[in-house]
Amino acid sequence: MELVLKDAQSALTVSETTFGRDFNEALVHQVVVAYAAGARQGTRAQKTRAEVTGSGKKPWRQKGTGRARSGSIKSPIWRSGGVTFAARPQDHSQKVNKKMYRGALKSILSELVRQDRLIVVEKFSVEAPKTKLLAQKLKDMALEDVLIITGELDENLFLAARNLQKVDVRDATGIDPVSLIAFDKVVMTADAVKQVEEMLA
């Protein structure tokens, strides 16, 4: 199959298995959930009554005070006491093998092509690391919410995009399923397309 280059009067021949396969929604969902779960820190921690700092002495005698009986200031029902079912640091990551991950990326790329959300260009760059230059270039292309993928990371382009809220710049090795579906449009250079094809082959 062929992808039309927007900035040149030509087309790029690409593999149909990468850019023309059926959309596997269940697979994409599983991989996206696993990717997001893997990004969680999982470092939250709370203290049980055994771990809270404080005396182990009984606050007051059992009977005769008129107050409710109490055995510890570290009780979970006391203010500043321990937590009954305290959270523990945990690993939230889910296992996804390479075949599934690559299959999900191919499904997403193919769906982007079908929805006309993938724009392929010969090259994409700015003359200087200026946000204004990139903003004008995107405006001329009628792009606002966009992921730009280049063969090699262009430092000028990367620096120019840092202050644009709905614009992200990655090299071909830095793509992931979440970023591909998070933006309205994806701009890829011809070099990036070839690299992605090789990665997913």
Curated annotation (Swiss-Prot):
GO terms for biological process: translation. The keyword Endoplasmic reticulum does not apply. InterPro entries: Ribosomal_uL4 (IPR002136), Ribosomal_uL4-like (IPR013005), Ribosomal_uL4_dom_sf (IPR023574). Keywords: Ribonucleoprotein, Ribosomal protein, RNA-binding, rRNA-binding. Pfam families: Ribosomal_L4. The keyword Chaperone does not apply. GO terms for molecular function: rRNA binding; structural constituent of ribosome. Residues 44-71 are annotated as: Disordered. GO terms for cellular component: ribonucleoprotein complex; ribosome. One of the primary rRNA binding proteins, this protein initially binds near the 5'-end of the 23S rRNA. It is important during the early stages of 50S assembly. It makes multiple contacts with different domains of the 23S rRNA in the assembled 50S subunit and ribosome. Forms part of the polypeptide exit tunnel. Part of the 50S ribosomal subunit. Belongs to the universal ribosomal protein uL4 family. This is Large ribosomal subunit protein uL4.
